[in-house]
């Protein structure tokens, strides 16, 4: 497969690393890239510039027997991200395939931080012993600086296959997608009146069901996000009998308590007798006898 690059690499514009041998490993192992010198980085830092990778070329040259099997995985990571989100681009290709990998950066980085990009490789499902020096890697970097970052048009990674026995059907490569973003509403007087962060205020002639249909944006209408934020927004289409919640929990609990009281006739007679006796003792006092003078 021919390279899809518009401009082939020019060695005079690229910083080249040494073509070094690397041992076969089933775990991710770093490929050392040559970055600008400390003096160059300091000069760019003093000029308050930021930097990006315009183009990165990773050359892979295999040195294994013709019956060697397995796949090589090469990954570029951005260490500004968390470990599980740092992967930016990856390639897979046969271990016997001589190939050039091409990568284009989509972001700037500050020279006040360490250079964030790291390059790794590993070999999967191979019949070659581990720690065998199975290939040579060489990196070429073209970087640029700017006074401030700007939007960079996305350019997909690509490859140039140099071994004639392999085609584009034997390789694969990918790039990470754009990060997802959800709008966060700001708490204000307007948001408190539409029921997002404050209670819904019912006005004359309105019901809870109709007021709860108010959302932050018409774009949420009919969407899963809108349904999640306003699960009762369609209640106003139901009749009042369906919306009636029925008796409260306290009334139901009281009725259950009353219905569970059981008493025998002897206990009931004893309560009545004690009650009557108490009333007599309290309200019925005997009159004092009159004496004759």
UniProtKB/Swiss-Prot annotation:
Q: Which domain of life is it from?
A: Viruses
InterPro entries from the UniProt entry = Gemini_BL
Q: Does the keyword Phosphoprotein apply?
A: yes
Q: Which GO terms describe its molecular function?
A: DNA binding
The membrane-topology field of this record reads: Peripheral membrane protein
Cite the post-translational modification comment: Phosphorylated.
Task: Locate the compositionally biased regions of type Polar residues.
Answer: 209-222
* Localization of this protein: Host cell membrane; Host microsome membrane; Host endoplasmic reticulum membrane
Can you quote a single GO CC term? Answer: host cell endoplasmic reticulum membrane
Which Gene Ontology BP terms does the record give? transport of virus in host, cell to cell
Record's keyword terms, sorted: DNA-binding, Host cell membrane, Host endoplasmic reticulum, Host membrane, Host microsome, Membrane, Phosphoprotein, Transport, Viral movement protein
What are the transmembrane regions?
none
Q: What residue spans carry the region label Disordered?
A: 207-228
Q: What does this protein do?
A: Movement protein involved in the cell-to-cell and systemic transport of viral genomic DNA. Begomoviruses use 2 proteins to transport their DNA from cell to cell. The nuclear shuttle protein (NSP) shuttles it between nucleus and cytoplasm and the movement protein (MP) probably transports the DNA-NSP complex to the cell periphery and facilitates further movement across the cell wall.
Question: How does it associate, per the subunit comment?
Answer: Binds to dimeric supercoiled plasmid DNA.
Q: What is the similarity comment for this entry?
A: Belongs to the begomovirus movement protein BC1 family.
Q: What is this protein called?
A: Movement protein BC1
């Amino acid at each position: 497969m021919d390279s899809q690059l518009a401009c082939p690499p020019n060695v005079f514009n690229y910083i080249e690393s040494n073509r070094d041998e690397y041992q076969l490993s089933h775990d991710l192992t770093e490929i050392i890239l040559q970055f600008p010198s400390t003096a160059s980085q300091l000069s760019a830092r003093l000029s308050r510039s930021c930097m990006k990778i315009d183009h990165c070329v990773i050359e892979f040259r295999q040195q294994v027997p013709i019956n060697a099997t397995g796949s090589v995985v090469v990954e570029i990571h951005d260490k500004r991200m968390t470990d599980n989100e740092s992967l930016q681009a990856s390639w897979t290709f046969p271990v016997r395939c001589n190939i050039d990998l091409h990568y284009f950066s989509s972001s700037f980085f500050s020279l006040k931080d360490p250079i964030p990009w790291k390059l790794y490789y590993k070999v999967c499902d191979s019949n070659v012993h581990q720690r065998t020096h199975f290939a040579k890697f060489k990196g070429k970097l073209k970087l640029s600086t700017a006074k401030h970052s700007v939007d960079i048009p996305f350019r997909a990674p690509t490859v140039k296959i140099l071994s004639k026995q392999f085609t584009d059907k034997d390789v694969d490569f990918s790039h990470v997608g754009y990060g997802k973003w959800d709008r966060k509403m700001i708490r204000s007087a307007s948001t408190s009146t539409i029921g997002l962060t404050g209670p819904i205020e019912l006005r004359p002639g309105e019901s809870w069901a109709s007021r709860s249909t108010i959302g932050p944006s018409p774009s949420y209408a009919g969407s899963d996000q809108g349904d999640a934020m306003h699960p009762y927004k369609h209640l106003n289409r139901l009749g009042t009998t369906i919306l009636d919640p029925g008796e409260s929990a306290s009334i139901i609990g009281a009725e259950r308590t009353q219905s569970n009281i059981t008493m025998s006739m002897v206990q009931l007679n004893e309560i009545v007798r004690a009650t009557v006796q108490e009333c007599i003792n309290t309200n019925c006092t005997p009159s004092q006898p009159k004496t004759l003078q």
